Amino acid sequence: MDFDTMGSLEAKTNNVAAIFHIFYPDLYEEIFEVAQNLGEGIDYYVTVSEELTGLIGTIRQRFPKAKILTVENRGRDILPFLEVLKRILPLDYELLVKIHTKKSLHRDDGTSWRKDVYEKLLGSSETVAKARKAFQQDSALGILGAQGHVLNNRFYKGGSQNLVQALAKQLGLNANKTAEFPFVASTMFWARPELFKPLIDARIEAAEFPGEPLPQDGTLPHALERFFGFLAIEQGFSVKAISKEGTISDPEPLAIYRYAPVPKPLAIRNVRSLVYYPAYSEAYAIEHLRVTALYQAAGIEL
């Protein structure tokens, strides 16, 4: 994996890095379109699968100064991201934004999923400005994901929890804390590059990522999708969400994700309430949450 020689990696030009992974050739135009909202002052890093080297000329036309990395079709968008991080962490960027050509072929709503994330992260120059300003004003902000896509691992751990715990142990972190933390589904976000340094220092090898085709859950890429959030929290950073209007908010701990099956603890028992109250019997919990549903929806703890 080597960067295209036309893009020098010896020094950065700006303080913000945009990292794009292109796997689906029919979607790269969407990335080019939303990237226009980034404006000036951005260094571009683009990873493409080895099968798409024919796109390099087109990418070069759109982003003449981009650093382009051809990668093996392994690790989805996660391994290419780590490969870029290895190379740019010494450059001390203040901020990065990461997106990719997500399709989610196993779902009928994959297009709306992708476009919703793009719109909330890069949908307008105003949104971009508000995202960057949020990091300037809050030194504890570590990761900023699209509103509605920042989830609670407590309910959306899937089949990856053992791998998340193993990663925590590998990095010398407390694996007992991996039960509940926020993470960004889809691995598209704004973030502070330095929070990923412990992961890069762990030297995860490409061979540790399984080859394609991957199952829908339970692999190292799925675990790292969640682990990024845990890594941020464990280092004292926060994980927040941004709306298409650029409003910054804390993630909703009981949010139901429209792009995944509803977890059993959050199953809708009636149109007015969500059920998860492990300290009492289920019958009591249903009635309790029926009464308190409006408060929970507002994020008010009782």
Describe each region flagged by the PLM.
Residues 1-302:
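ER/Golgi luminal nucleotide-sugar-dependent glycosyltransferases, focusing on the catalytic module
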